[in-house]
């Protein structure tokens, strides 16, 4: 399975706090404040879009208020206007609001024409989502027929984002069998409608009833459930908010637990209202007695980036070449990472602070070089972090307000006075990114990142892991076009002996290549450096800085697409290689990797979930090899293979988000996380995919008793997607979390197998049941479980609530496979009536070798459907005599009703006028 394996490639996580979310949303007396809606820089300037956003939120607020029994409404919203739009007096500079922490992103569809609203969800049921996505055409009302009013859709997506709800429809399986009946996947079950198919042939289409498959007993995939125009049922918003009568979430009383949808699968059959009721929002509010006010809006426009480096030069920075490594990382940031046009200042500190450079705008190489000369070269003195921060505020205020500015704070020392400036930090409106260097950095350091929405990173003293350079490489702007951001392609290090070589390759794909930099560092003597481009041409021109112990090559123009080859030779020292680049075009989105953990504190024995999102614009990158390297404060590392398989820690298969549980704690303290991503080489292929967490696309709607069909919904075809993917490698930088409550070795086994979330069941033959699922491990999704317990019941709630009392299946011959493997098990139900029309529910529990049990799996369902026997053929020398009568409803018109006796497939219809 490769869960724990060594890798020389490392990709640092770009840590966007998650549950740990960087979101600024907070609840204040029933009203949601701090909502950030960002307009993507690639959206053409259109002032009406701002009004459309306001209209959507204004419509959504009372709908949300009534749907939550007068408990929640939208109080204020900040709209981020792109920097490349015209400035206006009413546009203010943001404070902590950035594109990185935006809750809603308005962007052009990718691929074109796919305007489905959706929410990115990485976590479990009840865990907050990441971000809502809308397109300009959707906000302009051009998709009303497909999705319904924009305000209602916003509430549907808000429920994904804020409360971790899932959809109550299912595009992959629209119908299911229950008690011999075919039922649509819907909630509530009382929503009325018709099961029909839009049959098109020869350029014309006709609405026809769905036909039952004689083998499966279900309707064909093209069959659709079209809700009636007039409804009385009020639930549920997570099924179809577009139905006029739907104004509520499903409750325990009207929730359809049998429907095979994501809400039932991910939330253990709980209704959406039950999940909302368990949320922190619900627990700390009571219903309002008056109507809420309308939302208020602030318009914020991104301006030039303002950054001040605040760098520790205390005596402890002389340990283990820390100051030299800081200079190397600082040079990468100043020469490459920080964007053109940015303003950069620098402060150093020990027990006092020293201004090394006032704010200086990056206009070209001269400015970058000048700033590198201000980096510290001597370490001495104590540690006063607040002195450094206060000095940085002063540097910034000499030219700009501190609102929305950024401070990069690096320290390796302890400082028990850091909390004395917390209030000043909060009032400043500045975003603080923290870099903890070594094992003794101030324990409260990360609080500065948390309170301001900055990145928190940790770099150990293990130079070969390149952690400090990766941390500074992560500090690209949280705003602006992604085409301007620095992207790490490779980050690698190695300790060499006896004239050994460090050999390898770097893939420069077609989405990057501008401003490409090769950076090499060493700890003793300059190594021999050999580099060839994809055509085999040797590259010269490395700038060698022996004082800083680094060399770098800036590739002119756009680097050649293909595989670059390098060889580095040295003896008895550590080398590192970092390669960065920028997008090759402003119109072609680059492949990007961002990542996060689900918590900033890992409290043993609770696992930490590591996520990596790999996308090109709005399209997911599939079948990539993604590896996370997790380094503890004592230098030990664990390697995880992250997976996009929809099992274990991974919420959704094939969404470009790769996930895995981390359980291998070995000590308390900080852990850094690094990930390597390699893709586009051995990609598999399968059918088309659609957004899993989006509003339902209406196939059609009833109007005046007639069905009006919408165009078929656009789908992402994985075949097309993979054919366009090219080989690539990526690194992205800088995340950490803090572990606590880790016992001394030997660490006891307190981790159970993870929950099975992808159990599927189907009938095999006349009476066998075929089960498939992804194997959990001994410790969550690592190792191998000891055994499985499978139980069945004809009552779905009994199986959920009384699992141990339900009938157990004989699994003597079922031996668990290694975690992440596919399991298949076929059995014949015994000691239970299993006949035509029987609905049977199945669930699994995994148990490890010390008898720790997983949570009960999702519940799978099978319905035994025995096709009716085909009647024997009988000779029919002549047509039978039908039963007939004639009715006259309108003078002059007679309708002959003909009732034929059984003639197999013969159907006749006669109309006379």
Swiss-Prot record:
SMART domains: VWA
Glycosylation sites: 503, 514, 770, 804, 810, 836, 885
Listed GO biological process terms: calcium ion transport; proteolysis
Signal peptide coordinates: 1-21
Predominant cellular place of this UniProt entry's protein: secreted
Active site: 157
Keyword Protein biosynthesis: no
Annotated GO MF terms: intracellularly calcium-gated chloride channel activity; metal ion binding; metallopeptidase activity
Biological role stated in the UniProt entry: May be involved in mediating calcium-activated chloride conductance. May play critical roles in goblet cell metaplasia, mucus hypersecretion, cystic fibrosis and AHR. May be involved in the regulation of mucus production and/or secretion by goblet cells. Involved in the regulation of tissue inflammation in the innate immune response. May play a role as a tumor suppressor. Induces MUC5AC.
Entry-linked PANTHER family: CALCIUM-ACTIVATED CHLORIDE CHANNEL REGULATOR, CALCIUM-ACTIVATED CHLORIDE CHANNEL REGULATOR 1
Domains as described in the record: The metalloprotease region is responsible for autoproteolytic processing. It can also cross-cleave other CLCA substrates.
Protein family per UniProt: Belongs to the CLCR family.
Name the UniProt record assigns to this protein: Calcium-activated chloride channel regulator 1
Species this protein is from: Equus caballus (Horse)
Lineage: Eukaryota, Metazoa, Chordata, Craniata, Vertebrata
This protein's encoding gene: CLCA1
